[in-house]
Structure formats: structure tokens, C-alpha cells
């Protein structure tokens, strides 16, 4: 069997089923990698919680809602760590302008629960905070309220409070019941967010106008401007993005997703749920799409073009974009050919990016890992990896150090929590969750990512510190 127990895991042998070495001789689907389970005690995980999954991923990118976190101050602060991850524009679907640009990045409200609130209950405090927040920000179109571990344990009824406040305030007040302990990873929060939005919002409003070429772009969160790249491609093809779920989206867009002609699911781990629900109830079909890397981007633009009879327009976009990026792609391939890379993403990016990085940059993908991926995602990683690649579910800190020692990656695509850990080991790291200098999606986005990888590897600082092969001046070529 191709499962592997790393040396550091001798005292937690259960980890063996979470670590897989690709072997093409094994029958396809024969080895089911263990995943989406509670982290084993003693394993220093890098995972986020269910609350992070709903607020930090699903709803954090919406431009015109106010977020109220029912928690002690720590969870509220944690819930506001979106930084540049989800930029928004003030323009609204009806032509009006939202009064605060990047409102979602600037404001969050918490109930600041204390010991007394835990003992006697915090529902009255929550009502008071919602009323005060509504007066402070009267222009928001909805208020989203979040449970956390503390309020989940004491049993505060967020649904009842939100129902009462919605009637009082005359705007949608929606409860998201995903306290941190609700699931093994942030993936549970994705699930709760999808179902809450579908059950409470989808089908409750009508769009200002519709066309025969309307799509929902689902699971696209506009990380560092990703959505705006795809929006331009679709615009050039004559296709209208009616609703986003949820990058640069408005509350209203979530309410009229049922009016689209087709849904495209970009992040297949966090948002396939709502696409399935919309198809089942409203008959809107969906396609799973991948826009990372030139080949996948072209392939999926063609699929969308074929669905709407826009094949010629799709080919024109592909040709124009490839002509733009080819010279830079050739340069970065010449500099990155053969260099070892570890892709350590939360979920789908680990399998989205492995083949394009090998195909267009000539890099050697030696390791793949995920923090909250499910079985179908690991099957895709296994399918796209070459023999000998190590694939890890929920890697802990000691495992990461051992993988660096044994597989010698020259760069890691990972998250902010791991970035400086790898730096201490002398390995450059580029953030793949919120990006360094994005966007990373689409044709030009792939070049942006290649540039950041190149700059990180050839940064002269590594040579000055006695690590790597950075050469002064190389990063400025």
C-alpha cells in the first residue's frame, strides 16, 4: 500500500492513512486517503475552524452587508483578518454607488461577550448590538450574524434573535450557525454558509434586468482581484455575470441567483453545494470550472462558449490572452525549469495548479497537501501527480519540517500561517491563499504567480543568509 508513516509520527500512527505516496501501479480509486476528520490530538494542525469557513471565506467578500460576530473579542478580531484578500468596488447592480469602498475589509462588529454573558446568556446583548450597528451603518442592505464556540456552547438562539431583528429593522438579518467546533475544518463553515444562503436568500428578490447570457459565478471570491479578470473575459465573450458567490457581490445578487441560465463553480470544495441546490429547485444547470493556468483556462472558456453558442468569441479571448503572455511564460520557464515545488493549499488549488506548474514552468512538483480537502479532491491530486509525489492531508508542523528535509522543495506555495515557518527552514514561500502580487487566475494571473515564484527563489537575501541559490540582480531581470 502506498500510505506512508513519517518518522515524526511514530507516536500517532493514525497519521499513516492521511499520507499517500503516488504510485501509478495502484488501481485508480483503490487507496482512499483519510481526510475531513478531526485532527488527531498531538498533531499541530494548520487548519482553520468552521467559523473561519463561513465568515472568512463564504460571506467575507460581500460588499454591502454588516457582519456581527456573537463572541468574545478574540473571535471578532479573527473574523476580520481578510486584509486585501477580498477587495470590492462600490458600484451596485442597479447603477447606484455604495457609500464606502471596500466596506467589507474595514468594518466588523462584535458583541464582546464576558463571563457574565456566558453565565446569564447573551441574546439581549446581541439584540442591543444589532440595533446599535444598524443605526451606525444604516446604508447596509443586510446584517449577517455569526455563532462562535462560546455562543454555541451556551445555546443562544441566533435564529430567533435574527427573526425578531429582521421584523424590527425591515432588512434581512441572517444567522449563520457555524461555531468553530461544528466540524473538523473550515469546510463545515463553507457547508453551513451555502445552505444558509440558499434557504434564507435565494429566490427572494428579482434582478434589475436579465439577459439570455446570464451566469452565476460561484466559488469565486475575488482574491486580490481574481473575479475582475474573469469578468473581463466573459464581457468580451458577450456573457453577463448576473450573480457572484461571493467575490465583489452584493446581498441582492445572492437573492436572485435563481434567475441565471448557467452556474459556474470555481472553488469546487467550498461552493458546489449551493450550485446543486439551485439546480435541484430552480433547474439552473452548473459546470465545474478551473481557470488556473493557460490550458485549463482556455478549456473552460471554450466549454462556457459552447454552452451559449459563443465559441468564436471564446477563441478570440484565448488567442489574444495567449499572445500577451507567451514571451513572459518562456522566460519564467527558462528560470524555473526543474526546480522543486510543494503546493500546500487549503483545498482545490493543490490539484488546480500542479499540472500547469509542471507544464508551463517546467517545475518538479514533489509534494501536495490540503488542510480541508475531501476525498474527491485527494483523488484529483492523486490523478494529476506523478509517481513518487507525497500527498498529505492536514499536515502538522513536524511533518512539514520532515518533508522539507526529505523532499528538498526549493519553494512552497502555502498560507500565511506556514510562510514564515518555511522561511526559518531556508525555503522561500509564496502565499497561495491571499497571494503576493495577484491576481493569480486566468492567463495573465498565471504569469503573475510565476513572477512571484521566480522573485522568491532568486531573492538575493537567501544567498546572503547562506540558503538557496539567490543571485544579486536576478530578481530584477
From Swiss-Prot:
Biological process annotations from GO: nitrogen fixation
Keyword field contains Transmembrane helix: no
Gene3D superfamilies referenced in this protein's UniProt entry, alphabetically: Nitrogenase MoFe cofactor biosynthesis protein NifE, C-terminal, Nitrogenase molybdenum iron protein domain
InterPro entries attached to this UniProt entry: Nase/OxRdtase_comp1, Nase_asu, Nase_comp1_asu, Nase_comp1_CS
Binding site for [7Fe-Mo-9S-C-homocitryl] cluster: 267, 433
Binding site residues for [8Fe-7S] cluster: 49, 75, 149
Cofactor entry: [8Fe-7S] cluster; [7Fe-Mo-9S-C-homocitryl] cluster
GO molecular function terms attached to this record: ATP binding; iron-sulfur cluster binding; metal ion binding; nitrogenase activity
Keyword Aminoacyl-tRNA synthetase: no
EC number: 1.18.6.1
Cofactor binding, note field: Binds 1 [8Fe-7S] cluster per heterodimer. Binds 1 [7Fe-Mo-9S-C-homocitryl] cluster per subunit.
Catalytic reactions of this protein: N2 + 8 reduced [2Fe-2S]-[ferredoxin] + 16 ATP + 16 H2O = H2 + 8 oxidized [2Fe-2S]-[ferredoxin] + 2 NH4(+) + 16 ADP + 16 phosphate + 6 H(+)
Keywords per UniProt: ATP-binding, Iron, Iron-sulfur, Metal-binding, Molybdenum, Nitrogen fixation, Nucleotide-binding, Oxidoreductase
NCBIfam families (alphabetical): alt_nitrog_alph (TIGR01284), N2-ase-Ialpha (TIGR01862)
Functional summary from the UniProt entry: This molybdenum-iron protein is part of the nitrogenase complex that catalyzes the key enzymatic reactions in nitrogen fixation.
Subunit structure as annotated in this protein's UniProt entry: Tetramer of two alpha and two beta chains. Forms complex with the iron protein (nitrogenase component 2).
Family affiliation: Belongs to the NifD/NifK/NifE/NifN family.
The protein's name: Nitrogenase molybdenum-iron protein alpha chain
Source organism per UniProt: Methanococcus maripaludis (Methanococcus deltae)
Gene: nifD
Amino acid at each position: 500500500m502506498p500510505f506512508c508513516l513519517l518518522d515524526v509520527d511514530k507516536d500517532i500512527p493514525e497519521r499513516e492513512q492521511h499520507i499517500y505516496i503516488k504510485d501509478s501501479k495502484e488501481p485508480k480509486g483503490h487507496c482512499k486517503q483519510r481526510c475531513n476528520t478531526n485532527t488527531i490530538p498531538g498533531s499541530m494542525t494548520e487548519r482553520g475552524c468552521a467559523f473561519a469557513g463561513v465568515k472568512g471565506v463564504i460571506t467575507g467578500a460581500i460588499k454591502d452587508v454588516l457582519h456581527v460576530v456573537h463572541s468574545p473579542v478574540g473571535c471578532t478580531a479573527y473574523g476580520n483578518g481578510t486584509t486585501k484578500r477580498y477587495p470590492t468596488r462600490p458600484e451596485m447592480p442597479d447603477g447606484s454607488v455604495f457609500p464606502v469602498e471596500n466596506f467589507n475589509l474595514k468594518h466588523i462588529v462584535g458583541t464582546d461577550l464576558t463571563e457574565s454573558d456566558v453565565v446569564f446568556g447573551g441574546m439581549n446583548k446581541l439584540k442591543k448590538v444589532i440595533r446599535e450597528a444598524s443605526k451606525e451603518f444604516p446604508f447596509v442592505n443586510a446584517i449577517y450574524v455569526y455563532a462562535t464556540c462560546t455562543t454555541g456552547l451556551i445555546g443562544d438562539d441566533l435564529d430567533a434573535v435574527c427573526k425578531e431583528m429582521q421584523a424590527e429593522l425591515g432588512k434581512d438579518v441572517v444567522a449563520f450557525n457555524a461555531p468553530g467546533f461544528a466540524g473538523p475544518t473550515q469546510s463545515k463553515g463553507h457547508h453551513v454558509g451555502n445552505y444558509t444562503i440558499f434557504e434564507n436568500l435565494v429566490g427572494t428578490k428579482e434582478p434589475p434586468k436579465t439577459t439570455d447570457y446570464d451566469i452565476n459565478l460561484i466559488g469565486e471570491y475575488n482574491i486580490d482581484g481574481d473575479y475582475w479578470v474573469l469578468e473581463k473575459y466573459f464581457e468580451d465573450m458577450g456573457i453577463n455575470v448576473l450573480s457572484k458567490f461571493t467575490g465583489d457581490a452584493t446581498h441582492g445578487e445572492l437573492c436572485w441567483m435563481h434567475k441565471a441560465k448557467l452556474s459556474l463553480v470555481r472553488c469546487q470544495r467550498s461552493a458546489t453545494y449551493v450550485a446543486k441546490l439551485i439546480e435541484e429547485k430552480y433547474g439552473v444547470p452548473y459546470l465545474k470550472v478551473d481557470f488556473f493556468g493557460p490550458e485549463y483556462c482556455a478549456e473552460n472558456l471554450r466549454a462556457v462558449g459552447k454552452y451559449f453558442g459563443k465559441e468564436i468569441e471564446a477563441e478570440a479571448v484565448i488567442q489574444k490572452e495567449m499572445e500577451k503572455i507567451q514571451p513572459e511564460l518562456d522566460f519564467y520557464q527558462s528560470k524555473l525549469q526543474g526546480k522543486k515545488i510543494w503546493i500546500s493549499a487549503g483545498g482545490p488549488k493543490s490539484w488546480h495548479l500542479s499540472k500547469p506548474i509542471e507544464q508551463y514552468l517546467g517545475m518538479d512538483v514533489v509534494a501536495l497537501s490540503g488542510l480541508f480537502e475531501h476525498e474527491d479532491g485527494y483523488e484529483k491530486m492523486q490523478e494529476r501527480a506523478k509517481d513518487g509525489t507525497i500527498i498529505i492531508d492536514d499536515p502538522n508542523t513536524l511533518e512539514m519540517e520532515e518533508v522539507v528535509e526529505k523532499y528538498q522543495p526549493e519553494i512552497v506555495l502555502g498560507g500565511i500561517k506556514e510562510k514564515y515557518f518555511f522561511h526559518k527552514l531556508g525555503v522561500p514561500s509564496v502565499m497561495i491563499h491571499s497571494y503576493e502580487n495577484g491576481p493569480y487566475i486566468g492567463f495573465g494571473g498565471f504569469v503573475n504567480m510565476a513572477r512571484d515564484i521566480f522573485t522568491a527563489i532568486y531573492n538575493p537575501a537567501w544567498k546572503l543568509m547562506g540558503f538557496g541559490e539567490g543571485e544579486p540582480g536576478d530578481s530584477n531581470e
